[in-house]
């Protein structure tokens, strides 16, 4: 546990020193989600209808922006090789990096999304559902993304390949996350979508760290 916290703290300190990387993803999310109300106009019914899809797609793409850097810096300076030689299990170190990525790229979106949701005339209950789906869904995005980030380590044009690998795997999260918000906005029960998102999160937590750690080991060998 001490090693896990050390990895998280180290990654967060590095992010604080490179604030522009985090701000770029947040700025992208805010700009993309704010352009739709400006382009569509004051049609509240239409804005409520498109809000779940727009907000979730923007969150997905914003998360994707920071994935390439999850392991890249440590790979380039040799830190990953040193971590692999440490007595701590690689899966623990990879988990720390995934958590740090979510804190930096996912958690700010959870905080910002309700504010953006007001532009789409979402009611309070829909905003609560939006927060809940993002809390369940964004960790899944970071977990799945870690596999792509590990598989593309040291690969030329890795960012393009990463997108091609990861985006199809993001589709279930997008469907269930946006579907829950839409169901709530039209007065339907969103509990089924929450259950499916929770199942995806549990499955990802159980499998992905081991897959990512194996991919990292292959990349550094």
Regions flagged by a language model, labelled:
Residues 128, 135-167, 217-221:
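A structural motif at transmembrane helix-loop-helix junctions in multipass membrane proteins
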Residues 51-67:
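Long, hydrophobic alpha-helical segments
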Residues 95-120, 140, 144, 177-178:
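Hydrophobic alpha-helical transmembrane segments that constitute the membrane-spanning cores
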Residues 39-50, 114-135, 153, 181-194, ...:
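Membrane-interfacial helix-loop-helix connectors in multipass membrane proteins
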Residues 64-84:
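Transmembrane helix boundary and interhelical loop/hinge segments in multi-pass membrane proteins
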Residues 1-25:
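Aromatic- and glycine-rich beta-strand/loop motifs that create alpha-glucan
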Residues 19-41, 56-59, 165, 169-176, ...:
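Hydrophobic alpha-helical transmembrane segments of multi-pass membrane transport/permease proteins
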Residues 205-221:
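Junction motif at the cytosolic side of a transmembrane helix
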């Amino acid at each position: 546990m001490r090693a896990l916290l050390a990895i998280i703290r180290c990654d967060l300190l590095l992010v604080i020193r490179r604030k522009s990387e985090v701000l770029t993803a947040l700025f992208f999310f805010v700009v993309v989600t704010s352009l739709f109300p400006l382009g569509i106009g004051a049609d509240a019914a239409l804005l409520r209808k498109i809000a779940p899809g727009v907000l979730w797609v923007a969150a997905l793409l914003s998360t994707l922006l920071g994935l390439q850097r999850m392991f890249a810096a440590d790979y380039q300076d040799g830190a990953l090789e040193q971590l692999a030689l440490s007595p701590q299990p690689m899966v623990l170190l990879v988990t720390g990096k995934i958590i740090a990525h979510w804190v930096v790229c996912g958690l700010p979106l959870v905080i910002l999304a309700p504010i953006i949701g007001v532009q789409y005339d979402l009611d309070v209950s829909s905003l609560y559902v939006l927060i809940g789906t993002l809390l369940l869904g964004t960790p899944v995005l970071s977990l799945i993304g870690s596999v792509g980030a590990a598989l593309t380590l040291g690969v030329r044009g890795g960012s393009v390949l990463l997108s091609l690998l990861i985006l199809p795997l993001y589709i279930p999260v997008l469907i269930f996350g946006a579907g829950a918000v839409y169901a709530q906005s039209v007065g339907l029960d969103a509990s089924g979508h929450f259950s499916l998102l929770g199942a995806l999160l549990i499955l990802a937590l159980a499998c992905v760290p081991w897959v990512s750690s194996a991919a990292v080991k292959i990349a550094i060998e």
